[in-house]
């Protein structure tokens, strides 16, 4: 509703006509005062250019309206301090993101040169990003690739979906363990679209356990989707050495698997 033509809010596909009166209202930008906070983040690797940090489940990556404290950025500002500035004041050091209720590892850039190199690696699809996920249903094959474009859900702008005019999205997966009603899988991202694994697994009929947005109603004792970014691998932006870090499953995910194994026994 920020653009009006002849006093009326118009749709994005409106074609401007001669003598139309166009009024654009500038959105008020609130400069948030983002403060460093001691959140005791686990840092898996750090040197003068890059860091690999663990984001626990339930933590937002960067500040946004209503979330100005307790974010990964607040913790990074306290523990790392030197962070790249390319993404602005509310996203220092942030090269890529994972969802609030997904746990796991993220690359962090400590200067702009490192930031650009890491982004280039993401764009050229050379960063290794592997996730562990628990899905509903029993996947009959041992591995597969989902190549389906993702964009905004036309019926619900707050969620994503596989859509014809979406951006390229490719997810590779392989089965780690079969259960009676569930399958434990490892997913490797070739692209990094919003909610990619969650949308793709729903698309092929195996939605993530606990997913409040794309899954069925809650049936197991876990808050949020059972998804963990356990492996990150990339080339160091300065030394060009290969760095790969692994993070074990969080306790709630491990407990969930143990409960299912006991139930199936």
Explain the meaning of each model-derived region.
Residues 1-265:
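RNA pseudouridine synthases
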